[in-house]
Amino acid sequence: MQPLRQSFRTDQSLQWTRVHDLPDFVYFNHSIHIHKGVGCTTCHGQVDRMPLMWQESSLQMEWCVDCHRNPERYVRPRDQVFSVDYTPPANQLEVGRRLVDEYQIQKLTSCSTCHR
């Protein structure tokens, strides 16, 4: 916390280390993922339990494509998107299929979905 206090007292910006750094040619929009029911912890992990932030998931194309091909495995109710305590139900695939339909999630795997 000392660097934060020092920054506040001196009005000097903190020096940040980027943890999640996608290649420049990858387009990623947080808002569409949130709107479609992808929870923060799905990609970022249990950040509330990380003493220092680290990259939980590879964020490599194969990892992203798995979710795009099988969103029913990962979506959750919109009111649970920001919950760090959310646990998928035992019948996640059933619930996920319903949410995919309700949220009108398309299984977008075209290159141009992410590469622009």
Please state what every model-predicted region is.
Residues 1-15, 21, 46:
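Membrane-embedded segments
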Residues 16-26, 30-31:
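Short, solvent-exposed interaction modules
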Residues 29-116:
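Sequence context surrounding c-type heme c attachment/ligation sites in exported
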